[in-house]
Design a protein with these regions (language model features):
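Intrinsically disordered, low-complexity segments enriched in small/polar residues
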Residues: 1, 22-25, 125
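N-terminal secretory signal peptides that target proteins for export/translocation
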Residues: 1-8
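Bacterial N-terminal signal peptides
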Residues: 10-26
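Flexible, solvent-exposed loop/hinge segments and secondary-structure transition points
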Residues: 28-184
Length: 184
C-alpha cells in the first residue's frame, strides 16, 4: 500500500486547499461587523408614536366634553395598529371603531360618505358588507389618513353622540399633523 503524497494531487487542488485554510484563519482573526441599523419605515406606514398622537388627540376631544369612546388606528392595508377604550366606555366601542377605520382605509373615504352612498345605492354597496362581513361599519366616525395624497392609514372612533365620532377622529388627525414634521 502506498502512502498519501501531496505531490500526487493536481496542483490546482493543492492551491484551492491552501486558499481555503488561509481564508478560514483570516476570518477568525477579524472582529465581527456591527449589526446593521434598523431599516426606516416605508412611507406608507405610520409609526407607533404617530398612532399615539392620534389616539391622544381624539381622547382629549372626548374628555373635554366628558364623553367616553373607543378609537382604532389602522395602516394603509386596514390592519390594526392600535385600539383603545376610554375608562368607562363600552367594550364594543373599539371593535366598532376598528370596523370604521378599516372601511375608511379600504375605500379611501370617510365612513360618513360611504354610509350616504349605501343609502342611495344599497345594491352597489351591499357588496362591501358581504365582502368584509362585520369588518366594516358604514356610519360616521371613520376617516382616512393621507400623506402627500397617499393613504397611510385610517382612524375610527365609536361611542360618541351622533356626528361627534368623526369630529373626534379629526381632532386626533389634527394632533398627528402637528407632530408629523418633527417625526419625519
Amino acid at each position: 500500500m502506498t502512502g498519501f503524497r501531496l505531490s500526487s494531487l493536481p496542483a490546482i487542488v493543492v492551491l484551492a486547499l491552501l486558499l481555503i485554510v488561509a481564508l478560514g484563519r483570516a476570518g477568525l482573526a477579524q472582529t465581527p461587523a456591527a449589526p446593521a441599523p434598523a431599516p426606516a419605515l416605508p412611507p406608507q406606514l405610520i409609526t407607533i408614536a404617530e398612532t399615539r398622537a392620534i389616539i391622544d388627540g381624539a381622547i382629549a376631544y372626548a374628555r373635554e366634553r366628558n364623553w367616553r369612546m373607543g378609537i382604532a388606528v389602522v395602516d394603509h392595508a386596514g390592519d390594526l395598529i392600535a385600539a383603545e377604550r376610554m375608562d368607562g366606555g363600552s367594550g364594543r366601542n373599539p371593535r366598532f371603531a376598528e370596523a370604521k377605520a378599516f372601511a375608511a382605509a379600504m375605500y379611501r373615504q370617510t365612513t360618513e360618505t360611504l354610509g350616504a352612498l349605501y343609502k342611495t345605492r344599497p345594491d352597489r354597496y351591499f357588496g362591501i358588507i358581504n365582502m368584509y362581513g362585520n369588518k366594516v361599519y358604514l356610519v360616521g366616525g371613520g376617516v382616512p389618513l393621507a400623506v402627500d395624497g397617499k393613504l397611510v392609514g385610517a382612524v375610527g372612533v365609536a361611542g360618541l353622540p351622533e356626528g361627534e365620532d368623526e369630529k373626534a377622529a379629526r381632532a386626533g388627525i389634527a394632533a398627528w399633523e402637528k407632530m408629523r414634521p418633527a417625526q419625519r
